[in-house]
């Protein structure tokens, strides 16, 4: 597995859970002897939903809600088989979406 790179992309609505998960991944990879670059914060995606407050009329009265999706990127350079095995066994919170590319 020499000169390979694992790219891990994390997404979550809560940035605290996201940072805790990123630290767990970095700590696990460093313990197994791999070189880690990150966590790199990526731009936060903000989605705004505008709805009418009233049911039938009063179009001027609206309410806005937003959803923020926080993202982090972690690169693991030259991972060992032990690194891959320990990352597979890692237990992360359910609010974090993980994409792994080899």
From Swiss-Prot:
The alphabetized list of GO BP terms reads:
translation
Q: Does the keyword Cytoplasm apply?
A: no
Question: Which InterPro entries does this UniProt record tie to the protein?
Answer: Ribosomal_uS10 (IPR001848), Ribosomal_uS10_CS (IPR018268), Ribosomal_uS10_dom (IPR027486), Ribosomal_uS10_dom_sf (IPR036838)
Coiled-coil residues are none
Q: What GO molecular functions are on record for this protein?
A: structural constituent of ribosome; tRNA binding
Do the record's keywords include Transcription? no
| A single cellular component GO annotation | ribosome
UniProt keyword terms in alphabetical order: Ribonucleoprotein, Ribosomal protein
The record describes its quaternary structure and partners as: Part of the 30S ribosomal subunit.
Any idea what job this protein has?
A: Involved in the binding of tRNA to the ribosomes.
Which family does the UniProt entry place this protein in? Answer: Belongs to the universal ribosomal protein uS10 family.
State the name under which the record lists this protein. Answer: Small ribosomal subunit protein uS10
């Amino acid at each position: 597995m020499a000169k390979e790179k694992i790219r891990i992309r994390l997404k979550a609505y809560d940035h605290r859970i996201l940072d805790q998960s990123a630290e767990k991944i970095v700590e696990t990879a460093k313990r197994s002897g791999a070189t880690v670059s990150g966590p790199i914060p990526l731009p936060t995606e903000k989605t705004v939903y505008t709805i009418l407050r009233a049911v039938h009329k009063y179009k001027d009265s609206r309410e806005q809600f937003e959803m923020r999706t926080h993202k982090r990127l972690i690169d693991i350079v030259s991972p060992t088989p032990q690194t891959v095995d320990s990352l597979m066994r890692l237990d992360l919170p359910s609010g974090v979406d993980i994409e792994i590319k080899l």
